[in-house]
Amino acid sequence: MKQEIDFIKFNPTQNMTVLVKTNHPAETYPHIAAQIMSYDNVYAEQVGFIAGAIKPEAAAHLEMAGGEFCGNACMALAAYIASENELKSTDFTEIILEVSGTDQLIRCQVKQQHNQYFCQVTMPLPEQIEQRTVKYEGIDMDIVIVRYREFIHIIIEVEAFDETMRKRAQALARLLGLTLGDKLIGILLYNAQSEELAPLIFVPQLDSLIWERGCGSGTASVGAYLAWSRQKEIVQHIKQPGGAIKVMAEWNGAELERITIEGSVGIVAQGKAFIDA
């Protein structure tokens, strides 16, 4: 028997994102997401579910299929709400969201630009940033751990995105998925010279391991790391396979004060998906 799913598909920096409009029990989210993400269905890198917000100041609640936090999905939902409200103003409109993976309300500034929506999102601040040298697969590896409440990013500076490093990153992501209780593990390969990022995102609950074409939260973590290591404000366009995402990390002299990412979102499809119930 087939089940109908109402969905919208978005393109935030080619990090193809599907948001589900119909209501479903939370325990069915991984099952629905796995089918929607597959090549023979709607096909996407991630799936989120739109629900009513609990807090009165929030316009909606976004629950990612694996309970993770996702910056690009926040942009996508803000763009959708703006489109539903027929936002035509050239000025920014603020949309506040409740989002899985963080207890902070997420503030999104949105304005329409041609056939897309330009979004600025204030991101959750990391709880801890630390630099370590770990022995992995027989070599000493310098890593930066950027820890949030329910997810963790590991930044590894590289000179090239070669196949050996990619395979090592994939094995490390799965290992951390087994040993840590986080809802999301990101391995972020970063080339400081070219300001390029190759983001690998693992969501253990979905067993989803994807080299994303653009990663908003990964971009925020790179900005946080650069501000922390240089002890100063950072404004940088982080190049990724799907395009660049701008990050602004404010440093107050002692700690990170605020992180914002900017990017464009296109609404590329809307309709019904049919999945096995």
What are these model-derived regions, one by one?
Residues L125-V144, E163-L172:
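Active-site glycine-rich loop that binds ribose-phosphate moieties when present
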Residues Q116-L125:
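Membrane helix-loop-helix hairpins that form the core translocation module of multi-pass transporters
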